């Protein structure tokens, strides 16, 4: 056990010696000669000085402090240097000003001397004067020195002294600051200083040179003026009491902000000036103004707060000077386009006539039976446009007059429109989808067999087309029109209008008048894009109704259900041959711009149905069940064409009625005979997906354990041979 003890003793001595000569554990590399010298002094200290406790001893932390931390008297620490400090007496500055001003005897100022310096090592650029030449009487008259006390820097260990509650508890001036009064008290105080003479009073709005004389204003409403000349545009949040009394030759209208806000009828803004904060609220003159002002002081503050929200200046001032409200509408003799909202009801002719009658009466009675709020600014009568808000009974009609012509807005519509917005394609055109009605099926007798051919379908009128073309210039509505003339149009006929010339400005309100001029006629001239779209739609309608036959391309054919109900007498036995032409829809691979073409292929199948009449009711029930079952089967097998991968194809029906096996077998044989040439074109049994055209590429189906298609991602590959169908299309 002795050798390990010896090793431990040697290791302890080595660590003790190394600790005396090495850096502290928490030290950093020595930077600079000063720190190195301090560290050497620390190492060379004797143990007695290191163990001093009463005096300030040197520790390892001292080497990381700046040298000359405690500068001698009259020096200041700056940039690791002790700079001599010279305290300037404030009286010296006063003496210099007196020397520059000159002595009392009118002698010139003495020449500057260089014995007064501020302590800079370099040459000072300041001018120093000799203070000995100042008269003694002048020195005695100087004020006593201020601030000549202790200007020494605070102690290095003293905490910083500053008031963090300066705003809440100010310590600077010591003067009493007057607290602002609440708005309601301020309004009540301001009301006491207003003259209450009932004869006449004058109200002057701020930032405006116009003075309005108001006769016979009650004293209770004089307190509603703006207190203290508050600018509404500069401080809208503080405008709690806003009122302006107006005087007009027809009626005296006085506004009060303590009343209900619902009485506000219009807001008058100056039209031809800059933003001067002049906002006027014109309320109804029928309101009760006889109430005492003291009764409304309780709920006045809430009403004023709501009115302040209503009077947000940025909500009423336009963004730029050429605003929407100030531009006159462009009236012209144009037809009116359908309005923007398609949910309005079509007005009757009686309503339009009544509106025109009201407009004619308004033109005669302007200025007689109405409360009018016009612009305050002076304007000439015939050269400028004045906007007038006219109130007659329950109807509010906006009237805009330019020179001598007056137009009245009516709510009548020009033409009936569909209740739903039609779809819009990329050329701003509308595709109106007209719902087709289901025609009733007529029952056939035993002596007549109905044969539906493609020629009969082609003879149908154009009014049964499912797609119609309607060309609209813009989405425009009429808000201000001049005697709209109704146009007669049916939903089946396309609405044809010529392009309206664009207006000079981009005003939203003035461009709402759409349509075309009275002198402009179509004349059959249409744009090329319009003709192309009409040709496409006509082609689609012909293909849907079976006007084109394309039998050169074999595809899978569909047998539409043919329900033949045979009514026979109870005592007779009849055998007839019913020749039925089945029209099937085939999807081809030459695709058009709008939708894939649909061709019609016909296949005539002769189905011989023998019925032995034992009971007429039994025959009808069995044959009706046969037609229903075959319809469900063929519809579910071939019509969907794998449009949904989760629909599993079934080859035959699981349950068939026993009494109709013969009829169903004949129908199935006809179906297999029709699909035989198509199935021979794909010997490997490949069935293309409905969305994949025959372009030489094929996509095999991979089924998982559940019988569903696997992921279609990255499973395209080319066989470079194509099918017979793809070869014929190339």
From Swiss-Prot:
<feature type="compositionally biased region" description="Low complexity">
    <location>
        <begin position="478"/>
        <end position="491"/>
    </location>
</feature>
<dbReference type="GO" id="GO:0003384">
    <property type="term" value="P:apical constriction involved in gastrulation"/>
</dbReference>
<dbReference type="GO" id="GO:0016331">
    <property type="term" value="P:morphogenesis of embryonic epithelium"/>
</dbReference>
<protein>
    <recommendedName>
        <fullName>Protein folded gastrulation</fullName>
    </recommendedName>
</protein>
<dbReference type="GO" id="GO:0008360">
    <property type="term" value="P:regulation of cell shape"/>
</dbReference>
<feature type="glycosylation site" description="N-linked (GlcNAc...) asparagine">
    <location>
        <position position="639"/>
    </location>
</feature>
<dbReference type="GO" id="GO:0070252">
    <property type="term" value="P:actin-mediated cell contraction"/>
</dbReference>
<feature type="region of interest" description="Disordered">
    <location>
        <begin position="663"/>
        <end position="683"/>
    </location>
</feature>
<feature type="region of interest" description="Disordered">
    <location>
        <begin position="361"/>
        <end position="424"/>
    </location>
</feature>
<dbReference type="InterPro" id="IPR031761">
    <property type="entry name" value="FOG_N"/>
</dbReference>
<dbReference type="GO" id="GO:0001664">
    <property type="term" value="F:G protein-coupled receptor binding"/>
</dbReference>
<feature type="compositionally biased region" description="Polar residues">
    <location>
        <begin position="504"/>
        <end position="513"/>
    </location>
</feature>
<dbReference type="GO" id="GO:0043519">
    <property type="term" value="P:regulation of myosin II filament organization"/>
</dbReference>
<keyword id="KW-0964">Secreted</keyword>
<keyword id="KW-0272">Extracellular matrix</keyword>
<dbReference type="GO" id="GO:0007374">
    <property type="term" value="P:posterior midgut invagination"/>
</dbReference>
<feature type="glycosylation site" description="N-linked (GlcNAc...) asparagine">
    <location>
        <position position="193"/>
    </location>
</feature>
<dbReference type="GO" id="GO:0060662">
    <property type="term" value="P:salivary gland cavitation"/>
</dbReference>
<feature type="compositionally biased region" description="Low complexity">
    <location>
        <begin position="663"/>
        <end position="676"/>
    </location>
</feature>
<feature type="glycosylation site" description="N-linked (GlcNAc...) asparagine">
    <location>
        <position position="590"/>
    </location>
</feature>
<keyword id="KW-0133">Cell shape</keyword>
<dbReference type="GO" id="GO:0021782">
    <property type="term" value="P:glial cell development"/>
</dbReference>
<keyword id="KW-0217">Developmental protein</keyword>
<feature type="glycosylation site" description="N-linked (GlcNAc...) asparagine">
    <location>
        <position position="289"/>
    </location>
</feature>
<dbReference type="GO" id="GO:0048018">
    <property type="term" value="F:receptor ligand activity"/>
</dbReference>
<dbReference type="GO" id="GO:0003383">
    <property type="term" value="P:apical constriction"/>
</dbReference>
<dbReference type="GO" id="GO:0007472">
    <property type="term" value="P:wing disc morphogenesis"/>
</dbReference>
<dbReference type="GO" id="GO:0005737">
    <property type="term" value="C:cytoplasm"/>
</dbReference>
<dbReference type="GO" id="GO:0048383">
    <property type="term" value="P:mesectoderm development"/>
</dbReference>
<feature type="compositionally biased region" description="Low complexity">
    <location>
        <begin position="567"/>
        <end position="583"/>
    </location>
</feature>
<comment type="function">
    <text>Coordinates cell shape changes during formation of the ventral furrow and invagination of the posterior midgut primordium, by inducing apical constriction of cells in spatially and temporally defined manners. Could function as a secreted signal to initiate apical constriction by acting as a ligand for an unidentified G protein-coupled receptor, which in turn activates the G protein alpha subunit encoded by concertina, in neighboring cells. Such an intracellular pathway would ultimately induce contraction of the apical actin-myosin network.</text>
</comment>
<feature type="glycosylation site" description="N-linked (GlcNAc...) asparagine">
    <location>
        <position position="252"/>
    </location>
</feature>
<feature type="glycosylation site" description="N-linked (GlcNAc...) asparagine">
    <location>
        <position position="51"/>
    </location>
</feature>
<feature type="region of interest" description="Disordered">
    <location>
        <begin position="197"/>
        <end position="222"/>
    </location>
</feature>
<dbReference type="GO" id="GO:0007186">
    <property type="term" value="P:G protein-coupled receptor signaling pathway"/>
</dbReference>
<dbReference type="GO" id="GO:0007509">
    <property type="term" value="P:mesoderm migration involved in gastrulation"/>
</dbReference>
<keyword id="KW-0325">Glycoprotein</keyword>
<dbReference type="GO" id="GO:0040034">
    <property type="term" value="P:regulation of development, heterochronic"/>
</dbReference>
<feature type="region of interest" description="Disordered">
    <location>
        <begin position="474"/>
        <end position="526"/>
    </location>
</feature>
<feature type="region of interest" description="Disordered">
    <location>
        <begin position="545"/>
        <end position="583"/>
    </location>
</feature>
<keyword id="KW-0306">Gastrulation</keyword>
<feature type="compositionally biased region" description="Low complexity">
    <location>
        <begin position="197"/>
        <end position="211"/>
    </location>
</feature>
